[in-house]
A protein has these predicted regions:
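N-terminal catalytic cores of secreted or lumenal carbohydrate-active enzymes
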Residues: 29-187, 218
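Glycoside hydrolase catalytic-domain groove-lining segments
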Residues: 114-124, 230-233, 256-297
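Aromatic/acidic polysaccharide-binding cleft in carbohydrate-active enzymes
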Residues: 281-361, 368-378
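Carbohydrate-binding surface patches
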Residues: 375-417, 450
Length: 532
């Protein structure tokens, strides 16, 4: 009896220990459904800036390190693959220095233009990244108009004088035209303000929504129309994630014609919806974000930024996400993805470069977000993106929890043969993993704790017509008869090469009586659309 009691006691202890250990390592797979047919916003890209002389600081590290930094920022095989470059339109301010300060202005007075390439140290970098990496989205943002246009005669603080609205509209148009004709730089996007709700000792200029509307409606629109300017105008770019500074322009018929994109930053705020922007069919760009506190270079900080991208894509449903500096001289905070030591001429890479790169390297301009179960289990966040033209796709899955998660991805409406994972964790940086076979329309993969993985693959962009199992481009009685033959095992496959895939009309990864019944209803007219 005592032996039995001892055995029972030991069994209970082992069960308790096993129960305590189990959650750390063994989980039933959670399911993510990825639906090719449910589409959301088009992605314009991801980007960084090297404003305030950071482009020159990169060059000062020497050609070898400059190329290494360029690769880390813009290469789609060695780095983050950024596709947007944000620059400052020089204002000639007197604050700062050669390491961190404004560029010279091309218009030092109302009657004087000074088109010298040396006035803008970003030009040489733009040429290099365009020729070396194909970067063709060039955004120039104005932190401040030249001092002679301002209410206080300074590039710091103050506002644009109303009697200089036309001068400012002309100033913007002339920069776009002359950068193309004199420097070979196509400014594709122009931001008319940076953080209009903030007065600073560095370059700044305050605006209200009403002032924006007056300037756009009465000055910028007619000037850009007259000069044939095609650059897209980014409106707003306030400190927080809000469309409020663009509302007046969005609701004015004339101003709306040149309000192409509503810009925002996200300092000290949460991502929100932009209902008016969406209703008017305009784009949404976050043009800047960073951490001005301590420089956390770990995976914890890195995952913070990948979660920000997830929120921006799913809540705001934005089109472009930009970090602040790509590489910068500040080693003590998080303003840059790469920190350069200008004394030792060395640099260090923060983990956030790679976690952001899990999106920016693989999701290319023109891709489209499509449906995926966004939060299948606590601390796991998933989004999916595709190139509608080629069938390439990327599924980004992040786990910022402390336990591994097994996730099954059920693919609806597309059938790749395999996916390739790329992972960033505390020990990996965009590391390519072993190819995973897709079987029966799904695959299962472990998502390690505190990591982010992008699953990359390709699918047939012309999958055929569901229900058309004989390949004659129509669903009819012939297909119905073939279904019947398949179910009673007279045939083991269908005449069309994609017949087995196209026969699964309810998307449950099997061909059975349910599909047969759905085809019957479709042919009888009881339903007008198949589930897939």
């Amino acid at each position: 009896m005592k032996k039995i009691i001892r055995l029972l006691g030991l069994t209970m202890v082992l069960m308790l220990v096993f129960t305590m250990v189990l959650p750390l390592n063994l989980y039933a797979a959670s399911t993510v459904t990825v639906d090719w047919g449910t589409n959301y916003q088009t992605i314009d890209g991801f980007g960084v800036s090297e404003a305030f002389h950071q482009s020159n600081n990169i060059a000062l590290l020497g050609d070898t390190k400059k190329k290494e930094i360029y690769d880390l920022l813009f290469s789609t095989t060695k780095g983050a693959g950024f596709s947007i470059f944000r620059s400052i339109l020089g204002d000639g301010g007197t604050w700062g220095n050669a390491t961190d300060g404004p560029n010279k202005t091309m218009q030092p007075s109302e009657t004087t233009w000074d088109w010298k390439e040396s006035n803008d140290d970003q030009i040489s970098m733009i040429r290099e990244i365009q020729s070396g990496y194909g970067i063709n989205k060039i955004l120039y943002t104005v932190w401040s108009p030249p001092a002679w246009m301002k209410s206080n005669g300074s590039t710091s603080r103050g506002y644009l004088k109303t009697d200089k609205y036309q001068a400012y509209a002309t100033y913007l148009a002339e920069h776009i035209k002359n950068y193309k004709s004199k420097f070979g730089i196509d400014i594709t996007h122009i931001g008319i303000s940076n953080e209009p709700n903030l007065e600073t000792d560095y370059s700044s200029c305050t605006w209200t929504a009403a002032q924006f509307k007056t300037f756009m409606k009465d000055y910028l629109v007619p000037t850009f129309d007259k000069e044939g300017i095609t650059a897209k105008v980014i409106m707003g770019e306030p400190m927080s994630c809000t469309e409020s500074f663009a509302i007046d322009c969005l609701n004015d018929a004339t101003a709306l014609t040149r309000t192409d994109i509503v810009g925002c930053h996200n300092y000290g705020s949460s991502y929100t919806t932009f209902p008016t922007t969406k209703a008017k069919g305009k784009g949404i760009w976050q043009t800047e974000i960073s951490d001005m506190n301590g420089n956390d270079t770990t995976i914890t900080d890195g995952l913070k930024w990948s979660k920000q991208i997830f929120d921006f894509m799913t809540i705001t449903q934005g089109n472009a996400w930009n970090y602040w500096w790509g590489a910068c001289y500040k080693t003590y905070n998080g303003e840059g993805l790469i920190q350069m030591d200008m004394n030792s001429k060395t640099y260090k890479v923060a983990k956030r470069l790679y976690t952001v790169g899990q999106y920016s390297r693989f999701i290319r301009p023109g891709w489209q977000r499509f449906a995926a179960t966004s939060n299948p289990v606590s601390n796991v966040y998933v989004t999916a993106y595709k190139d509608p033209a080629t069938g390439k796709f990327a599924i980004v899955a992040m786990n910022d929890g402390y336990t591994n998660q097994s996730i099954t991805y059920t693919l609806k409406g597309f059938t790749p043969d395999s996916v390739t994972p790329y992972t960033t964790s505390s020990t990996q940086d965009l590391a390519e993993g072993t190819k995973i076979t897709v079987s029966g329309g799904s695959f299962t993969a472990n998502l390690a704790a505190n990591s982010i993985t992008t699953f990359v693959g390709g699918s047939d962009v012309n999958p055929g017509i569901y229900g058309d199992v004989n390949g004659d481009k129509v669903v009819d009685a012939i297909d119905f008869a073939l279904y019947k033959q398949y179910l009673i095992k007279q045939i083991s496959t269908f005449p069309s090469p994609d017949g087995m895939k196209l026969a699964d009309v309810n998307g449950d990864n099997s061909v059975d009586a349910i599909d047969f019944a759905l085809i019957k209803k479709y042919l009888l007219g009881s339903i007008t659309k198949l589930p897939v």
